[in-house]
Curated annotation (Swiss-Prot):
Its EC number is 7.1.2.2. The gene is atpD. GO terms for molecular function: ATP binding; ATP hydrolysis activity; proton-transporting ATP synthase activity, rotational mechanism. It comes from Pseudomonas syringae pv. syringae (strain B728a). It comes from the Bacteria. SMART domains: AAA. This is ATP synthase subunit beta. Its main location: membrane. The keyword Ion transport applies. F-type ATPases have 2 components, CF(1) - the catalytic core - and CF(0) - the membrane proton channel. CF(1) has five subunits: alpha(3), beta(3), gamma(1), delta(1), epsilon(1). CF(0) has three main subunits: a(1), b(2) and c(9-12). The alpha and beta chains form an alternating ring which encloses part of the gamma chain. CF(1) is attached to CF(0) by a central stalk formed by the gamma and epsilon chains, while a peripheral stalk is formed by the delta and b chains. ATP binds at G149, G150, A151, G152, V153, G154, K155, T156. PROSITE patterns: ATPASE_ALPHA_BETA. Keywords: ATP synthesis, ATP-binding, Cell inner membrane, Cell membrane, CF(1), Hydrogen ion transport, Ion transport, Membrane, Nucleotide-binding, Translocase, Transport.
Amino acid sequence: MSSGRIVQIIGAVIDVEFPRDSVPSIYNALEVQSAAGTTLEVQQQLGDGVVRTIAMGSTEGLKRGLEVTDSGAAISVPVGKATLGRIMDVLGNPIDEAGPIATEERWGIHRPAPSFAEQAGGNDLLETGIKVIDLVCPFAKGGKVGLFGGAGVGKTVNMMELIRNIAIEHSGYSVFAGVGERTREGNDFYHEMKDSNVLDKVALVYGQMNEPPGNRLRVALTGLTMAEKFRDEGNDVLLFVDNIYRYTLAGTEVSALLGRMPSAVGYQPTLAEEMGTLQERITSTKNGSITSIQAVYVPADDLTDPSPATTFAHLDATVVLSRDIASLGIYPAVDPLDSTSRQLDPNVIGQEHYDTARGVQYVLQRYKELKDIIAILGMDELSETDKQLVNRARKIQRFLSQPFFVAEVFTGASGKYVSLKDTIAGFKGILNGDYDHLPEQAFYMVGGIEEAIEKAKKL
């Protein structure tokens, strides 16, 4: 356990000088001997015994000359069943005022990704109960899903609904990593889990937006380490990350503070490598699976921005939320033409599901093309076939909406879970013209097709 002294403090970056024969390794955790007991993580070795570190907490009250000790290892966090039902910070310390975490076992947050031989893939579908997702971009068990959307189109609400539906229907363990998001949402989420009686199956790790960049950069790794432990014990784990963009943003802040030259749009030059290091660890092995659902903020609604563009490469399914669809009052505001999944293959999901999904996409795409003609010349100028197609498209568009359980408080409508079988049957019926006689308003904000038929009787 060598010790050194602080020689420079610039924001969250602290330089510490050690004797030359005992310089700490990269990623070692250092402890500042002060009242706050701040933890530092070594990022660079500058030579002459000086290391540049990033603080995992506030640097208020620190000054030059304070003693710092090297722990000799990376940051480690508690893992295992004792973490379930608890809220922890980036260092694995409990922040829910419910006493210490009762486990001796701790794992370092920097771990190698599973080797090629250890990895395992699967094609089992994971039903979410959300019509548009199950139909157009089905999730795979052990797959990686991204929820892409700009500000305020419903990423977190969709994420909460997915957690509610999957965590309640799915009997395994879940880990939720709140990376640089609102503390209020973290609090809402905790109470949502508590009220649904699934809190004892969820471990919560928060590094919210008011915390220093070091915390936001590492909190995703803390959550992932806990998920890896459950996976290696042979469980099927769900890992929720909200929001992966804030992880990139924290990396940008740290990179600038460390004096690296920025790359495209001001992002860190190591963007792809940092994302790869995180994403390659989120994978399924022969022991167990990690199914991960990640919210991805899209700056200025531009999907070609380097951050969302780098994330795309790692995902099996992408759910794109659209502001145009949200402005029509259709929630969830998922764009069925922009969202994709690797599972959308007749050999995986079956011919009926595949044909229905592609049929829905064809009708919506054709409607999109006809919109300009309708805007200029009106509906009367369309051929009978096109008129019929437009009417069906409008019904499909409305039938893709659905009341959420987590939004009951705001909408007053009770949430609906729609099975995959009912989803396919409903859309297939609309495509075949079985419901051409029903008004389009009957399809808005309902669960299955039976409910739409009932609603039509009241209109």
